[in-house]
Amino acid sequence: MEGDMPERINLLRVGEGILLARDLDLFYGQNMYFMNKDVYTLKAEVIEVKDKPSHPVGKIAVDAFGHTPEYVDRGIRRRALLGIGKVDYGSIDEIFPRDKGIEVIGASSDHTILDIEDAERDLKLGDIVEFDIDYASIVYLTNCRNVQIVFV
């Protein structure tokens, strides 16, 4: 980053910079405008669409991953459930919907919950939602037996 390399270093890991070009921009302020940031795509199928309360009914407890989810009460909202979950991609903080107006609001091991109230397209059962992903998600996804990897 600063133009110099210690004499004894003989291996430089630049995987994320070449594959995604996210970290250099996000953490180090390096402008990576010339790099494609959409070379990996996570696609997940919508398996349910319903209007539901934005705040769960009942008591909120610790989930299977040791976290207590927090929800903002925004009234009844349109929700979509995807047939993919944390065991497939890691954390919801590491997947980024490409469709404007879609927000990832939660996930279990096997499912992901989206708020689609403000989505630009009308999602229906069987539709595919695309996500940009970060390096950690690539690690999970490429090691998951449930995920089909397609090279284009």
Residue ranges and their predicted role:
Residues M1-V152:
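Active-site anion/phosphate-binding pocket segments in diverse small-molecule metabolic enzymes
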